[in-house]
């Protein structure tokens, strides 16, 4: 199992488009992916679950990946988040 903590950098947080991009990226991997924000935990492969986290800009989230491709999954998701989900700075 690998984990990482990240700050949501895009201007709108985990709304539909970023959550959708996250799910598309997470679904490329076999690992189980969980995302936590505050005391809530979400399935990283469920757009509705991620949106219900209510992670706003500046929020910290923790991603946990467990499985055969866990490191690759975490790296891909980190790149997506740190790249502001493709949003210009």
Regions found by a protein language model. Give the residues of each.
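C-terminal structural segments of small proteins and small subunits
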Residues: 56-89
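Intrinsic-disorder/low-complexity, polar/charged segments enriched in Ser/Thr/Lys/Arg/Asp/Glu/Gln
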Residues: 1-5, 60-62
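Compact, glycine-rich, soluble single-domain proteins
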Residues: 7-48, 52-57
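A composition-driven signal for long, intrinsically disordered, charge-rich low-complexity tracts
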Residues: 1, 30-31, 39, 84-85, ...
